[in-house]
Regions:
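Short glycine-/small-residue-rich Rossmann-like dinucleotide-binding loops
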Residues: 32
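N-terminal Rossmann-like NAD(P) cofactor-binding module of classical short-chain dehydrogenase/reductase
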Residues: 26-28, 73
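S-adenosyl-L-methionine
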Residues: 1-21
Length: 132
């Protein structure tokens, strides 16, 4: 909920005040994957369009806009690209670019990095564009 989001932002800001730095250089994370997972969508055919989790990526973008890290890493399942016929992923990319980040998107396989799983993941790395 919006109240929980605001409370979390407030706690992070208070913790930052206690540190020597007032800035966050890197944010790493992503919303829960159930709404974007192809398996999850197959299980919840009738309710998936109304699932509030489809829009949790918007909170990630809000975090980026509030804390303005130099770099961020966003992770999720490959199904995020096709969920909602691609509209959520398109909106995610546009929203990130609109707040001043250039992004690179890759699909990675966990086992290529020593993880004992063959899971594929979409990774978005964003870099804050410096204003001239």
């Amino acid at each position: 909920s919006e109240h929980n989001f605001d409370s979390l932002v407030s706690k992070i800001k208070n913790n930052l005040k206690k540190t020597l730095s007032k800035n966050i250089d890197v944010i790493i994370g992503g919303p829960p994957c159930q709404a974007y997972s192809i398996i999850g969508r197959a299980r919840m055919k009738n309710s998936i369009e109304n699932d509030h989790r489809n829009y949790l990526y918007k909170y990630y973008v809000k975090f980026l806009n509030i804390f303005k890290p130099k770099i961020f890493v966003f992770e999720n399942v490959p199904g995020i690209k096709s969920a909602g016929n691609g509209k959520y992923f398109d909106d995610l990319k546009k929203s990130i670019e609109d707040i001043g980040y250039s992004i690179q998107i890759k699909e990675l396989i966990a086992s290529d990095f020593g993880v004992l799983q063959n899971r594929k993941r979409i990774i978005i790395v964003g870099f804050k564009i410096k204003k001239k």
